[in-house]
Amino acid sequence: MLFRSLVEAIVGLPTDMFYNTGIATYVWILSNKKSAERKGYVQLIDAGGFWQKMRKSLGSKRKEMSEAHIATVTRLFGDFTEAELVTVFDAAGQALSEPQLIAGTDTAPTAPEGGKLKRVPISRIFRNQDFGYTTITVERPLRDEAGQVVVGLKGKQKGKPQPDSALRDTENVPLAEDIQAYFEREVLPHAPDAWVDEEKSKVGYEIPFNRHFYVFEPPRNLHAIDEELKAVSANIMKMLEELTE
């Protein structure tokens, strides 16, 4: 479907949306009549945080999307634009408002002095080939007991090194990258005698949905953690002293 550019968008839904299953669910929007701007592209929309609790759960079904949530997803898809949720924090790390949806040409809020903005992507647009790869088979020569390369004796294999199945390996090369350039950069430095069996090459696609919406959270400052531990330890010691009095 990606190869034929039939996928317009993929929407990641919240978990616990269906009876007796808590697994992540995705809605694939397909079309064989894409608009010109969508041809060759796929839109990913992460609606995993768009939910509200049900008044009464049904098995594993505990969440539902409100009309407002559905309207937001519909807008993002219709606008075919990248978007993010932006939260403003003050210098003490307290959120000053609810996350604000910033899409397209919307103006993002500014952080106060000493504060910061937390940006979480909600809608992203990729080229079809960004998800594609070619699986190449990397062969290495079979060697005899003397360490000499074994070559074929008949037909098309005559005089050619024979592959050692025990040393056979595969590599996934992004579609946008030249296979030979990748091979020379990533394989030959480690295996100078290797070659690619082009007859075994296959094209595939993979969409690591969550990876494209991952936001790195830097670890807390070690000094701050150390100070908190000291404060907790001091409080515990004080409580113990009060118990022994």
Each model region followed by its residue ranges:
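A conserved structural/catalytic subdomain of Rossmann-like adenosyl-cofactor enzymes
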Residues: M1-E241
